[in-house]
Amino acid sequence: PGGLPWLSEADRRLQVQSDLPWWLVCRGAIHKFRCVPHLTGRRFEHGVTDCYTLFRDAYHLAGIEMPDFTREDDWWRHGQNLYLDNLEATGLYQVPLSAAQPGDVLLCCFGSSVPNHAAIYCGDGELLHHIPEQLSKRERY
């Protein structure tokens, strides 16, 4: 839309139905969009459809590629710090919460001394996130 390198809403609906990657040519460049299911209403499966997958998929739809990395359940209880260890290599950097912009990733510590949950700040006090044993959703915090 408007010469920008991302799929339109109609393209996304058709892509989800087809369950295939789509290619888009924009301003002479070719962009590949892997098939990403709807961001809300996903069932939670650690390492497959979890909070990291949700934010990775949301960023992909915005044209930003984040690496996938193997993660075992409860990695934060076994001395790993996967978010901080892996995200710095992608070019992300820490900002104060007061400076958060829509689209920024918020890292949270749930019963852990290291960040073990990621959420996307949507603006106006809303987050997009995926908690174990719940469907992914957008909600006020």
Residue ranges and their predicted role:
Residues E9-D11, E72-S136:
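...with weaker cross-activation on analogous glycine-rich loops/strands in unrelated enzymes
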Residues L39-G47, Q94:
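Short helix-to-loop capping/linker segments positioned immediately adjacent to catalytic or ligand/cofactor-binding
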Residues M66-R71:
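Surface-exposed patches in mature extracellular/periplasmic domains of secreted proteins
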Residues R138-Y141:
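Short, Lys/Arg-rich amphipathic alpha-helical interaction segments
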Residues G2-G3, V25-G28, C108-V114:
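Short, flexible beta-strand-to-coil junctions
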Residues R13-P37:
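Divalent-metal-activated hydrolytic enzyme cores
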